[in-house]
Amino acid sequence: MTKTKQEIYNKRPTSPHLSIYKLQISSTLSILHRMTGVALFFAVSILAWWLILSKYDNNYLQFANCCIIKICLVAVSYAWFYHLCNGIRHLFWDIGYGFSIKAVNITGWCVVVCSILLTMLLWV
């Protein structure tokens, strides 16, 4: 009897750590840092395109009063502040500070709280 590769692959056991792994704050923030970097690239590109178009047609400026656009701008500003704060955290890591588990957790939560506060200060 010959088993196909797919049958053998389907019957292979999964490593137990994959089923019980819990994301840590540092891994979550690392993933979010990369995601916000990509999102900011596209957001700045769209914003530049919108500003160029608004120079030629004032209807694009009126589009900014839309509620959905304001929500998107708040989200982009949060992503920017988060990316900024986490980038500062990475700069401290680059010079060798904050590598203990306690420091990583504290600075991670500080990044989240500071980015929320800075976004609120900008929009309130």
UniProtKB/Swiss-Prot annotation:
Identify which cofactors the protein needs according to its UniProt entry: heme
| High-level lineage | Bacteria, Pseudomonadati, Pseudomonadota, Alphaproteobacteria, Rickettsiales
Record's CDD domains? SQR_TypeC_SdhC (cd03499)
Q: Cofactor note, please?
A: The heme is bound between the two transmembrane subunits.
Q: Which gene encodes it?
A: sdhC
Q: Which residues form the signal peptide?
A: none
Q: Which parts of the sequence lie on the Cytoplasmic side of the lipid bilayer?
A: 1-29, 89-103
Per the record, its GO cellular-component terms are: plasma membrane
Question: Where located?
Answer: Cell inner membrane
Top-level taxonomic group: Bacteria
Protein name listed in UniProt: Succinate dehydrogenase cytochrome b556 subunit
Describe its function: Membrane-anchoring subunit of succinate dehydrogenase (SDH).
Annotated GO biological processes are:
tricarboxylic acid cycle
Its primary localisation, in coarse terms, equals membrane
Segments passing through the bilayer: 30-55, 68-88, 104-124
Q: Which SUPFAM superfamilies match?
A: Fumarate reductase respiratory complex transmembrane subunits
Going by the UniProt record, its keywords in alphabetical order are: Cell inner membrane, Cell membrane, Electron transport, Heme, Iron, Membrane, Metal-binding, Transmembrane, Transmembrane helix, Transport, Tricarboxylic acid cycle
Which ranges of this chain reside in the Periplasmic compartment per its record? 56-67
Q: Which PANTHER family match?
A: SUCCINATE DEHYDROGENASE CYTOCHROME B560 SUBUNIT, SUCCINATE DEHYDROGENASE CYTOCHROME B560 SUBUNIT, MITOCHONDRIAL
Pathway the protein takes part in? Carbohydrate metabolism; tricarboxylic acid cycle
Its assembly, as annotated, is: Part of an enzyme complex containing four subunits: a flavoprotein, an iron-sulfur protein, plus two membrane-anchoring proteins, SdhC and SdhD. The complex can form homotrimers.
Which residues are noted in the entry as heme-binding?
83
Q: How does it sit in the membrane?
A: Multi-pass membrane protein
Q: Which InterPro entries match?
A: SQR/QFR_C/D, Succ_DH_cyt_bsu_CS, Succ_DH_cytb556, SuccDH_FuR_B_TM-su
